[in-house]
Design a protein with these regions (language model features):
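N-terminal secretory signal peptides that target proteins for export/translocation
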Residues: 1-7
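Short S/T/G/P-rich N-terminal loop/turn motif that feeds into the first structured element of a domain
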Residues: 21-193
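Bacterial N-terminal signal peptides
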Residues: 9-20
């Protein structure tokens, strides 16, 4: 039996998706915040305090200012290596004195408002939270997939990936979780502008 390249590619992508849905790596939560007027620095300081708590519990945090498409929004991004570490961190939060103290302080003098939040899972099961250490310039294209068209969209993403990587981008593909059902986030990352 002869298989053409397109059929082989489809089989590989299908296997990749099947494995990914069971063994997601790089679990991420994104919280988009907007500072109250005159409270931008206070909000960043509060985010830094929370980042230290997350780090002590196995999470990795990045704090990113939006550049295009928003007004003064800050993404607070928490990553875990896998679903098990994510669940462990969530369990720790329930009984954490550090979190109770943090939220008591933050609620007494709020510095911003939560605008949106969502979770996502990297489709590449080899990715870990530590793969995202550092500071990156990135763009995220968010795609809402039509029912039954997931595989076609992922196939297109995978076809474009080597082209973009040859141009210097690092490409990461995420499936949306809570707050982003039916979405795929196609993220292009660069070391600098």
């Amino acid at each position: 039996m002869k298989l053409n390249i397109k059929t082989i590619h489809l089989i590989v992508v299908s296997i990749f998706l099947s494995i990914s849905t069971v063994s997601f790596a790089d679990v991420v939560e994104v919280f988009q915040w907007k500072a109250f007027p005159g409270k931008g620095q206070d909000m960043l300081e509060s985010m830094s305090k929370a980042a230290k708590i997350y780090a002590s519990e196995g999470g990795q945090v990045s704090i990113d200012a939006h550049n295009i498409g928003s007004t003064q929004l800050i993404n607070y991004v928490i990553r875990w290596d896998n679903s098990k570490d994510y669940a462990r961190s969530k369990d720790l939060q329930r009984s954490s004195k550090a979190w109770a103290d943090f939220w008591a302080e933050s609620n007494a003098n709020p510095a911003g408002e939560l605008v949106a939040s969502f979770s996502a899972n990297n489709l590449d099961p080899t990715k870990k939270a530590s793969d995202f250490k550092g500071s990156y310039v990135y763009s995220a294209a968010i795609w809402k997939v039509n029912p039954g068209k997931d595989l076609a969209l992922i196939t297109r993403f995978m076809e474009a990936k080597p082209i973009l990587e040859a141009a210097g981008a690092r490409v990461e593909i995420y499936a949306g979780g809570w707050g982003a059902p039916g979405e795929y986030h196609y993220v292009l990352m660069y070391d600098s502008w």
